[in-house]
């Protein structure tokens, strides 16, 4: 894992690091399971002065990926709805309508919390499209939550870059375990909510 961290950190010195970050952030919001935070952190640690630029890039790509996820959910649901209703226990037109009503009532907060936490954001972007929540509210909640998440990380590195990098270098294994636990907890919460 340490070698992977060092390798990702080296991307900050290449012209491809920002591109990789943008692609990862876009893909993670719609279809890919790996969050962009580790790469964002690595790039920010590699070039602390560019941390806010990396945070802005990650936010923009993540919101765009969320819009793509929303579109996939909205466009593809009608192709699979009958399969879900007929073959997935607990999924019926009635339960779908009930969850859709909850999404409609709490649309901003569902997307805001999903975008801010380690929960798999793509699950919520796809389901936002499936449940046809208010699109401007979806975009607003995505911009605020993803921006807050990534700009806090970028701001911390911008302010305390060298000290933060030293702490990560000294306690790398501990941070890796904490991140892994948060990631597993996020997936567990999603599984429990189903």
Q: For each of these PLM feature ranges, what is it?
A:
Residues 2-3:
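Selected transmembrane alpha-helices and immediately adjacent juxtamembrane segments
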Residues 6-59, 101-169, 176, 180-186, ...:
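Hydrophobic alpha-helical membrane segments of integral membrane proteins
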Residues 11, 79-95, 161-174:
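Membrane interface segments of multi-pass transport proteins and intramembrane proteases
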Residues 75, 189-194:
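Juxtamembrane and boundary regions of transmembrane helices in multi-pass small-molecule transporters
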Residues 52-97, 101, 105:
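Membrane helix-loop-helix hairpins that form the core translocation module of multi-pass transporters
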């Amino acid at each position: 894992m340490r070698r992977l961290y060092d390798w990702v950190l080296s991307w900050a010195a290449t012209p491809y690091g920002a591109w990789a970050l943008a692609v990862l952030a876009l893909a993670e919001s719609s279809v890919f399971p790996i969050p962009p935070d580790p790469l964002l952190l690595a790039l920010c640690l590699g070039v602390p002065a560019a941390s806010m630029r990396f945070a802005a890039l990650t936010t923009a790509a993540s919101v765009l990926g969320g819009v793509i996820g929303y579109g996939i959910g909205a466009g593809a649901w009608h192709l699979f709805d009958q399969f879900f209703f007929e073959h997935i226990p607990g999924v019926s037109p009635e339960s779908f309508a009930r969850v859709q009503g909850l999404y409609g009532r709490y649309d901003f907060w569902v997307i805001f919390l999903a975008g801010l936490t380690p929960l798999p954001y793509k699950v919520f972007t796809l389901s936002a499209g499936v449940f046809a929540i208010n699109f401007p509210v979806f975009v607003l909640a995505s911009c605020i939550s993803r921006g807050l998440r990534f700009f806090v990380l970028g701001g911390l590195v911008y302010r305390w870059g060298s000290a933060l990098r030293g702490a990560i270098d000294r306690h790398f294994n501990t941070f890796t375990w904490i991140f892994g636990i948060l990631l597993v907890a996020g997936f567990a919460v999603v599984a429990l909510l189903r």
